[in-house]
Amino acid sequence: MKTLYSLRRYYPVETLFNGTLALGGRDQETTGFAWWAGNARLINLSGKLLGAHVAHAGLIVFWAGAMNLFEVAHFVPEKPMYEQGLILLPHLATLGWGVGPGGEVIDTFPYFVSGVLHLISSAVLGFGGIYHSLIGPETLEESFPFFGYVWKDKNKMTTILGIHLVLLGLGAFLLVFKASFFGGVYDTWAPGGGDVREITNLTLSPSIIFGYLLKSPFGGEGWIVSVDNLEDIIGGHVWLGLICILGGIWHILTKPFAWARRALVWSGEAYLSYSLGAISVFGFIACCFVWFNNTAYPSEFYGPTGPEASQAQAFTFLVRDQRLGANVGSAQGPTGLGKYLMRSPTGEIIFGGETMRFWDLRAPWLEPLRGPNGLDLSKLKQDIQPWQERRSAEYMTHAPLGSLNSVGGVATEINAVNYVSPRSWLATSHFVLGFFFFVGHLWHAGRARAAAAGFEKGIDRDSEPVLSMTPLN
């Protein structure tokens, strides 16, 4: 049946040029969207949209469980995780499961349990997704008013925002409890080369925690990415958890103020654009975190950072040549600067050569050799431990550089290993996803603003190929 009145009133985003394509009751005519617009057809069907989201969560959790078990099945305890292309087990190891001193894996059973739990969860979510997509009510407003909503209902929207914030806050506290009471987490800075320990002396000083937000993002400052101890990381999660929970309660109990009602666009597509913008920012921050930070992402599991691999090479050859009789304190390099050691712009003693650009690296295998003014010459001559030599030689040959065809490491390094670091994968993937989510944010924000202003026309579908095909039903 042709609709005789304008759908504009109900579906402000697209005005239809034609509505002849029918698809299982969710056709163009009744929804204002063609089949390829995906979940847009479900904008006003809260029950079916719930099904789509639950099913999507099921797919995500299924991937996590299946990939987790795949990594367990292929895991070789004798090789470091980062040499085996693992991206999930390093996260579990960082949480303190299955590892001992030096990041050595002593038990893979917790990893197996994690995979199985995710698979079971995905089955429950998958069932819920199928149920709500095919069997459950199309809309929740009538039968389950608590779970129902209308996109324009500003008070309900901020209540939903509040519930999400409370859940995020509880998630932050899960990490706090794991680190402080349930077996601890892996600390790469533990003496002697890293170990699992419970974090009991949390940093709760607001000047320290919020001081990170005020730091410059550049150089040795590094904004929040510069955090280099677990006390600050776990203490930061206490603050995050409190802020999210209190903010969530605030949004549940209050209605949006007049300025917010005026300033924001209140539609499903607008909320989508806000979310995409936020996730984009998180993606870019995660990219920098995994690339530069070796405390939250320990090098024992993820491989060295770029600066770390470079400094490790300088250290390795300093050790070798010192054994061969070189005076590393005074040897001159080809440019007239120190060959092994030189001074930073602010006077600290640092490694010489090309790695001078990474002079503000901090790493657990190197810090014991520093004194009050940079690297300590007497410690370099007398205090270097075998574990520091072994680790730096290992990191030197596993720089987080590489291409998709797995020719990894520094192009000029003859001892490099044929691998690509998980750091490269995680940093690159989060950068690329952050970028695409940003583009999605711009796209949906533009459409939402246009719809609110009332001039979104849609696409002329007269020549759409699917219109000349046999209907599916």
From Swiss-Prot:
The record's subcellular location field reads:
Plastid, Chloroplast thylakoid membrane
- Classification via InterPro entries: PS_antenna-like, PS_II_antenna-like_sf, PSII_PsbC, PSII_PsbC_sf
**What molecular functions are annotated in GO for this chain?**
chlorophyll binding; electron transporter, transferring electrons within the cyclic electron transport pathway of photosynthesis activity; metal ion binding
Q: Which UniProt keywords apply?
A: Acetylation, Chlorophyll, Chloroplast, Chromophore, Manganese, Membrane, Metal-binding, Phosphoprotein, Photosynthesis, Photosystem II, Plastid, Thylakoid, Transmembrane, Transmembrane helix
Q: Which residues bind [CaMn4O5] cluster?
A: 367
Task: Please share the entry's free-text remark on the cofactor.
Answer: Binds multiple chlorophylls and provides some of the ligands for the Ca-4Mn-5O cluster of the oxygen-evolving complex. It may also provide a ligand for a Cl- that is required for oxygen evolution. PSII binds additional chlorophylls, carotenoids and specific lipids.
Residue ranges annotated as propeptide are 1-14
Q: Which residues carry this modification: N-acetylthreonine?
A: 15
Q: Which domain of life is it from?
A: Eukaryota
Q: According to the UniProt record, list the residues that bear Phosphothreonine.
A: 15
One Gene Ontology cellular component annotation held by this UniProt entry: photosystem II
Q: How does it sit in the membrane?
A: Multi-pass membrane protein
Q: Which residues span the membrane?
A: 69-93, 134-155, 178-200, 255-275, 291-312, 447-471
Q: How does it assemble?
A: PSII is composed of 1 copy each of membrane proteins PsbA, PsbB, PsbC, PsbD, PsbE, PsbF, PsbH, PsbI, PsbJ, PsbK, PsbL, PsbM, PsbT, PsbX, PsbY, PsbZ, Psb30/Ycf12, at least 3 peripheral proteins of the oxygen-evolving complex and a large number of cofactors. It forms dimeric complexes.
List the protein's name: Photosystem II CP43 reaction center protein
Tell me which species this is from: Anthoceros angustus
